[in-house]
């Protein structure tokens, strides 16, 4: 049988996340086929990909049924994988398809082990009602052994950062190599310097944008633009209390984002133990330093004092105020060249070169 070279199996394309961007780049750059669980109009345009796209159609609006459909879809609807030499799995559910590819090469690109199963298990449970907690625990008991069994069948595990490499070792007892996610550094450019600091992290509790808002309510002479959306939007607007120096730009398109990044003084990004974090790299590609946090993937991308400032791992609004006052427009300009040089280490070309070598390796 003549086998096709390779295919990527990814959870879904229902929105434009970092994992989806990575898979899109991989399929486009290496001419790989793609299989996925679901898609929506909010995700990437898969019609531009050169290879075959296979929709497993495991989407459902009902939480419990959605979990069953995902399990069934990736376990039972991926028999076509036997036609490929190499399968790359990306996401939480996609690895369940490994049973349908017993021969050939199986590569798992791990963005993170499911955080609701491991390091953020108690955090997730604490945010749920009693019935939801019971359902969540029952699902975890069902899913965790299936997930771990699938991971142990992989030939190669790739971590997106040293941070994730440690999680894989701690929680799954497996070794992993590191290949950082791709940043399209050619898409972000220094355009100038206006009078604002920029946050474009998703408005999710783990991104801790609330701490930024609290800080800027105490700095009326400093301007903050928040260019994103998410479940915390209304809470953050209430927290901002109508302060004129804080602007909520909402969801912006790619061109608007490039313009906002390219004209900022600096960008702000303080997530809780971020897996890797591509937005600081995009900021540095535009010559803009990052006010970040000294934990997670940011320790691998930001050079303290040269491409930004890192505050302590559990920052307070006062920490942000001090950092913003230190990261003046003049100091930010002095960091431009080193920022651009550092971002080049995470380019799309380097990512594709390393992934291509891994696929071809025997």
Describe the function of each predicted region.
Residues 125-157, 165:
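Membrane-proximal helix-turn-helix segments that form the acceptor-binding/catalytic region
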Residues 69-71, 315-319, 333-360:
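A charged, aromatic-enriched C-terminal amphipathic alpha-helix characteristic of glycosyltransferases
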Residues 33-97:
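Active-site donor-binding segments of glycosyltransferases and PAPS-dependent sulfotransferases
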Residues 289-292, 302:
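Short hydrophobic beta-strand element within catalytic cores of glycosyltransferases
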Residues 272:
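Aromatic "clamp/platform" in nucleotide-sugar-dependent glycosyltransferases that forms part
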Residues 189-207, 213-221, 225:
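Conserved donor-binding/catalytic core segment of Leloir-type glycosyltransferases
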